[in-house]
Swiss-Prot record:
Binds reversibly and blocks P/Q-type voltage-gated calcium channels (Cav). Residues 1-21 form the signal peptide. One of its GO terms (molecular function) is toxin activity. It comes from Platymeris rhadamanthus. Keywords: Calcium channel impairing toxin, Disulfide bond, Ion channel impairing toxin, Knottin, Neurotoxin, Secreted, Signal, Toxin, Voltage-gated calcium channel impairing toxin. Disulfide bonds join C26-C41, C33-C46, C40-C51. This is U-reduvitoxin-Pr2a. Its main location: secreted. Belongs to the venom Ptu1-like knottin family. It comes from the Eukaryota. It is found in: Secreted.
Amino acid sequence: MMKFLLVLFLITITLITMAYSEEHGCIPPFQPCEGVNSRCCGLYVCFNKICLATP
């Protein structure tokens, strides 16, 4: 049950972030990006050419 809730939570956060990115012109999580100065959404940073969450 906890795994299901965690997956549901992560999907919800991703969808909200993607909707936010369309509005503000930033790169959604897990999408390709170029360099450290890329505009990844929220607390995400460009790492290995993909927007990932900060540790």
